Amino acid sequence: MGLDIEMYGKEDRYLDFKEIEESLHDALFHTNNNWRSYLYLRKIRDYYLTNVEFDRDEIDKFIMDLENIKIFIPGDYDPALSELIKILSSHEIQKISIVGD
């Protein structure tokens, strides 16, 4: 069970969908406690309670949290995390909605 990210452009035009897979979520939140230091990561910790929207400024802060937590998770998750960061870094994306199951 992963988290779903829906991405939107200008005027709330739907762009794409990306999943934060369960294994990456576990690496971010269950293999260490450092996520508590990152405001935007704390917002997506709970599968069942997560239902957040980030505007472009918040997306950039979320990306910074992802970049900063990289050193605390196993290296085999680096490709998935780097891909997520690359996708979210597109400034065509103006808003994201992250929802759990």
Residue ranges and their predicted role:
Residues M1-D101:
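Acidic (Asp/Glu-rich) sequence patches and key acidic residues
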